């Protein structure tokens, strides 16, 4: 059963806390990873109005475009390339205040100015996907985003 997204105004942490609860409720009885990624990307995107919110799935030695919200996207990213590939390789969240300063950044859109990429791992610790969020503003993402997005991605195991 679909739930209506209910995120009222408030600060960033308050929005994330409410978003976390709603995603937890929505995903608790759904076992399909793509369905959960699709709903999570829509909920995150519409709560914060980010430029682009996408999941890339690990397929072999590439990240392959998965559920997303926003403009057209790069379809495939190699292991270790760009912000997404680096998050996968290093198995840790990447917070990039200015994408132009990130060595090897892959410019899917010139509108993207800052980015956060959060790896998603399975029960064995293997990276299965990454959540990539872009903003058209510099310095959009901070430790609050990192902490809450890591918690949200943890719901999708």
Task: Tell me the role of every PLM-derived stretch.
Residues 47, 107-112:
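Short loop/turn motifs at secondary-structure junctions and domain boundaries
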Residues 24, 134-157:
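Juxtadomain coupling helices with adjacent low-complexity linkers
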Residues 1-68, 72, 151, 156:
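Intrinsically disordered, low-complexity terminal regulatory regions
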Residues 52, 117, 130:
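Short hydrophobic/aromatic beta-strand element in the GNAT-like acyltransferase core
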Residues 114-122:
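A short, aliphatic-rich beta-strand micro-motif
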Residues 58-108:
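Regulatory sensory and allosteric helical modules in signal-transduction proteins
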Residues 121-135:
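Sensory-domain boundary capping and coupling elements
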């Amino acid at each position: 059963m679909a739930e209506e997204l209910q995120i009222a105004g408030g600060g960033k942490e308050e929005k994330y806390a409410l978003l976390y609860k709603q995603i937890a409720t929505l995903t608790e009885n759904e076992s399909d990873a793509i369905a959960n990624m699709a709903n999570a990307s829509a909920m995150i995107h519409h709560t914060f109005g980010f430029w682009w919110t996408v999941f890339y799935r690990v397929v072999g030695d590439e990240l392959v475009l998965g559920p997303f919200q926003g403009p057209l996207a790069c379809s495939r990213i190699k292991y270790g390339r760009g912000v997404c590939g680096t998050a996968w390789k290093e198995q840790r969240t990447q917070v990039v205040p200015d994408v132009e300063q990130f060595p090897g950044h892959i410019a899917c859109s010139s509108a993207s100015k800052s980015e956060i990429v959060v790896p998603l791992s399975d029960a064995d610790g293997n990276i299965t996907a990454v959540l990539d969020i872009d903003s058209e503003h510099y310095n959009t993402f901070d430790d609050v985003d990192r902490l809450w997005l890591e918690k949200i991605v943890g719901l999708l195991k």
